[in-house]
A protein has these predicted regions:
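N-terminal leader/targeting and accessory segments in enzymes
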Residues: 1-71
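Phosphate-binding loop of NTP-binding sites
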Residues: 66-202, 206-211
Length: 211
């Protein structure tokens, strides 16, 4: 878990540094709630030696807890060799993901993103919910910087990928519509390099060019 409020007995707690909160400030709460292992970053561990000693659970020190979360999710995904569909795009990701989930649920046990948890924290959390009961996964992926979709694809190792469209909603991050297409197109690049299947919306001229 990355949220001390949701920790259950036996959980591993990863202390994530976010924009508003630092998970390291909630380690004691997580342990009191039943966490059996805490994962902290080296900077915090070196700055808080007394706390490290006082914690009565095993501690794992890593350079970056966000990257550790992603690596755990990647390794966990590899335990279950099931089809994974990644859903990206400027608009309609969540709606498209939910429609696909509903259709596939008629025949398969589907793991799907909850809400729109589609970033470098939400995607690993989704994959860590994967278990032997699931026969397919539908995972939403979002981006606000170059390289993010590639990073998420390396965690998901999708067998299939879908980009809904290329729009102007992310211009503040990528500058031009071509920049948006390049960022979203990282999914198709990954699929191409790893022999995956791209589902292309040919009605979108930008997608036609990058597919």
């Amino acid at each position: 878990s990355t949220d001390s409020r949701n920790v259950k007995h036996g959980d591993v707690f990863l202390a994530i540094r976010g924009e508003k909160f630092d998970g390291h400030n909630f380690i004691t709460t997580a342990v009191q709630s039943g966490s059996c292992v805490v994962v902290v970053d080296r900077r915090w561990a070196e700055a808080n030696p007394a706390m490290m000693v006082s914690l009565n659970v095993p501690k794992l020190i890593v350079e970056n807890t966000v990257l550790a979360l992603g690596e755990l999710a990647r390794l966990h995904r590899r335990k279950w060799r099931i089809p994974v569909l990644a859903v990206g795009g400027s608009n309609g990701k969540t709606t498209t993901k939910e429609m696909i989930r509903q259709v596939l649920s008629e025949k398969f046990k589907v793991l799907a993103t909850e809400g729109n948890l589609n970033n470098h924290i939400g995607v690993p959390q989704t994959m860590l919910r994967l278990d032997k009961s699931h026969t397919i996964a539908v995972v939403e992926v979002g981006t606000n910087h170059f390289g993010e979709i590639k990073y998420l694809a390396e965690i998901l190792e999708p067998t299939h990928g879908l980009i809904t469209n290329i729009g102007h909603e992310h211009l503040e991050f990528f500058g031009t519509i071509q920049g948006v297409a390049k960022a979203e197109g990282e999914m198709f690049d990954w699929l191409r390099q790893n022999k995956g299947t791209a589902l292309v919306n040919r009605d979108d001229s930008h997608l036609s060019r990058i597919s």
